[in-house]
Amino acid sequence: HLEDITRADFYGFVVPFVNELMKMSAQAKIPVRIRACDTMGYGVPYPEVALPRSVPGIIYGLQHYSDVPSEMLEWHGHNDFYKAVANASTAWLYGASAVNCSLLGIGERTGNIPLEAMVMEYASLRGSLDGMDTTVITEIAEYFKKEMGYKIPPMTPFVGKNFNVTKAGIHADGLLKDEEIYNIFDTEKILNRPASVSVGKTSGLAGIAYW
């Protein structure tokens, strides 16, 4: 558990420390999983940025300078700079086999990596759900709201009440003509959430017609 790795001395401390861990792992014949922790959400997903902030640099460095196998490398992120999902996806793409998540991103301070976001990210990257029933995401959100009294911010992607709900008349007009125009994927099939409208001062005739 490499705490606060995005503010650590990567070459002076992290690499030598992990090298010793890997030696002990080999001697004891016990696999050691290395978790790179962006404890303060300070990491960035850009390969050009200097270590220790660069997530690509961290994942690459642990694999190539400390010989950590991809299958034993995971990422743990926070969302202080709105980069939890971007950093987690980058960690995957650069070789980490796993990312730590929490339901609805609930966690310390501004939260952790939302599990539902990474499920959708996985599907986007792989082009397949690989058997996952993603309608459970909606069921989980409803459980949190009804049984636990948890208030999900309305604008939260995939689970907020405003997700795939339009208030704009021009969008409603597009939905009337072809749902694909303003619904980025089949939200009813994937999340059991059909596209809908909220009628208000910006709805126009099309919004009322769709409603």
Label the predicted regions.
Residues 128-211:
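A mid-to-C-terminal "edge-of-domain" accessory segment
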Residues 81-86:
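Short glycine/serine/threonine-rich phosphate/pyrophosphate-binding segments
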